[in-house]
Amino acid sequence: MLRECDYSQALLEQVNQAISDKTPLVIQGSNSKAFLGRPVTGQTLDVRCHRGIVNYDPTELVITARAGTPLVAIEAALESAGQMLPCEPPHYGEEATWGGMIWRGRVARGAVRSAILSSARASLPALENICVLVAK
């Protein structure tokens, strides 16, 4: 069972502190796609604690979840309503996260970024609630 946790305030404080200290941040979930792209350095901002499905209305074909929500939890919720994501994200481990799927992207066709409706906080898109269209 997924334990939902809203760590928005704590994450925002960490980001503001990093800005104040001029410290680079590496936003990280399960780190399952760390091998993609070039290595980055900075203080790790772990978003795995910031998890849970915030809103899901199958009739509206929209799901909103926090960045650290495991991708398998999202897919299970959608499957229970006979729905699926509008893409086929790679699973590089059972702990792959919702935020990682969106912000690390997909190298081929079917990028979920094309289906993003909104992000609750434009200045911190990987940390806040991410709203995505789903397919029937």
Language model region names:
Residues I27-S32:
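Glycine-rich beta-strand-to-loop/alpha-helix junction loops that act as flexible
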Residues A34-P39:
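Short glycine-biased active-site loop of nucleotidyltransferases that positions the nucleotide triphosphate
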Residues T41-D46:
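Short, well-ordered secondary-structure micro-motifs within conserved domains or adaptor modules
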Residues M1-L25, R48-E94, R104-A135:
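N-terminal glycine-rich flavin-associated loop
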Residues W98-G100:
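Short, structured beta-strand-loop surface elements
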